[in-house]
Amino acid sequence: MTEENRTYITHLKVADVPWHRLTTAYGRGTDFPAHLAVLEQMKNPKAVKKALYKLTANMEHQSTLWHATPFGMVFLSRILEKALTESGQNPVAHFLAGELLDFFACILPVSYTHLTLPTN
């Protein structure tokens, strides 16, 4: 990863992403900011489960990744870091950390499936 890419990812804000233009499994990423905000708060277990389902179902479907997926992963990575930090004192954060780790484990093999490896 280049330093330029790392800087972009580090400073990217949810509002900077043109979610309405990014395709997902079921449409566009227009609702991603609201779902990410619910996850970031880690307060209401029912709302967190619903938001997480909406995001993950739209980011990966039948081993297909969508245009919104890389941007969603940036923010889910940040949320995972926060959830891991708070998981000892917040049961919602503990639940969310486990679910995000499972989702990341699901995404990793899919992302490698779509790589084109150089041939000699």
Regions found by a protein language model. Give the residues of each.
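N-terminal "cap/leader" segments of large eukaryotic alpha-helical scaffolds
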Residues: M1-K46
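Short secondary-structure subsegments characteristic of cysteine-rich extracellular domains
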Residues: E86-L108
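Short sequence/structural elements of tandem HEAT/ARM alpha-solenoid repeats
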Residues: H67-V74
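HEAT/HEAT-like alpha-solenoid repeats
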Residues: L36-Q41, V74-E81, T85
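Positions within ordered alpha-helical repeat solenoids
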Residues: A57-H61, R78, K82, D102-V110
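Conserved small/polar residues in nucleotide/adenosyl-binding loops
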Residues: T113-T119
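HEAT-repeat alpha-solenoid elements in large eukaryotic scaffold proteins
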Residues: V48-T56
